[in-house]
Each structure stands twice: as C-alpha cells, then as structure tokens.
Amino acid sequence: MILILLGPPGIGKGTQAAVLSDLLKLQHVATGDIFRKNFQENTPLGKESKKFINKGLLVPDEITNQMIADYLSQIVPHSNFLLDGFPRNVFQAQFLETFFTKSNLHLNKVIYFNAFKQDLMKRIEGRRICSHCGKVYHLDNLPPKIEGICDKDQKKLIQREDDKPNTFLKRLKVFNQETLHLVEYYRSKKQLFEVDGMQNIQQVTQKILKVLETEQK
C-alpha cells in the first residue's frame, strides 16, 4: 500500500502519519527527514539544497525530486510506504507518477486534511515540540504529562519558529499558491479522499481506515 498525505501546515499530518504507519505497517517517508539525512551525510544534493535554504529560497523541484527518488529507490522492494511532505506541487506529482510507473508501484490513495484558516491559527498557537527528539505536543489537545517537558526524553518543549504567527501565515500562503492546485490534480484523477483535519486524532484515523478498507474490498 502507498499513501500520500496532503494538508496545510499545522493540520497534524505528522501525527496522523505516525499513527497510520504504525497501524498499517507502512514505512513513514517524511521529506524533512530525507533532507536532514542528505545534510548530515553531506551528499551533493544536500550541499546543493543548502545553498538555496541558506538564502531563504525554496529548493528547486529538480533537486527535491532527485533526492526523493534516490531515497524511494532504496525502499521500493518493500513497496509499502506513506509519503508526508511530498509532492508539494503538480510538477512534483507528475514526476512521482512517472517514478511509480517505472518502478511498477501503485498509489492507493491521497488523503487531504482540510481546515479553515482561523482554526489552523488556533491549533498552531498551542503546538510545541521536543527540542531533542522532535515529538509533537499540543497544549490543549495533546499535552505532556509534565508541563513544558517531553514525556519521551524529559527534554524541554519549544515553539518552532515555523509555528510563530507571522512565519506560519507565510507558510500558509505558499501552501495555498502551490499545493491547492495539487489537491485539484488528484481530485481529477479520483485518487483524493478529503477529511476534516480539525477533528480529534482518533476520529480522523478511523475515517481514513474506513475509506481504505472500502477501497480494498
């Protein structure tokens, strides 16, 4: 099974990705992790990406596509994975489609988490992450056992720069400019399943599992 998760920043894709990958025994492929791996290993693609990131620019599609393809090529024999953070636009989606065809892979479903801007703003204000392991919490919906401290490794929780209001609004603008076209692209291919991303974690998970179960019958 291959799934793609789409949705605006702050919607909780990472949380759902972790839950679904565990329940469905899928490998969680997160774009951010792939970039970090390339940075740490100082690969040619990692070096090239850093040039753009250090200037505050988006990494060109060609570099991102190649980085993702290189990584996916290593896990193709398993062919059960969930993509979180890729594709971000139609060009990347078309590249991925070609890669899947060449690799004899089948995309089962694209899950799109939708939400209103004001609801996202409220959710993002309460989001905190562990400064060490990256585990995500929410002050209202998913608080740590001890205020300000990670349950997993007892490190300090922080608010990411990306989650601060001004930065978040910029990220949302980029999403609306690029990724909304991608939603329509997958909708036209009848591959899209839309879910209200503002429901609680369990409700969202159950709706996704139900539609996947129906698809497989």
Curated annotation (Swiss-Prot):
Main location: cytoplasm
Residues the entry annotates as binding Zn(2+): C130, C133, C150, D153
Listed GO biological process terms: AMP salvage
Keyword ATP-binding attributed: yes
Region NMP, annotated ranges: 30-59
One Pfam assignment: ADK
Binding site for ATP: G10, I11, G12, K13, G14, T15, R127, V136, Y137, Q199
Domain of life: Bacteria
Entry's EC annotation: 2.7.4.3
Keyword Metal-binding: yes
Region LID, residue ranges: 126-163
Amino acids binding AMP: T31, R36, L57, L58, V59, G85, F86, P87, R88, Q92, R160, R171
Subcellular location: Cytoplasm
Pathway named in the protein's UniProt entry: Purine metabolism; AMP biosynthesis via salvage pathway; AMP from ADP: step 1/1
A single GO cellular-component term on record: cytoplasm
The protein's role, per its UniProt record: Catalyzes the reversible transfer of the terminal phosphate group between ATP and AMP. Plays an important role in cellular energy homeostasis and in adenine nucleotide metabolism.
Domain remark from Swiss-Prot or TrEMBL: Consists of three domains, a large central CORE domain and two small peripheral domains, NMPbind and LID, which undergo movements during catalysis. The LID domain closes over the site of phosphoryl transfer upon ATP binding. Assembling and dissambling the active center during each catalytic cycle provides an effective means to prevent ATP hydrolysis. Some bacteria have evolved a zinc-coordinating structure that stabilizes the LID domain.
The protein, known as: Adenylate kinase
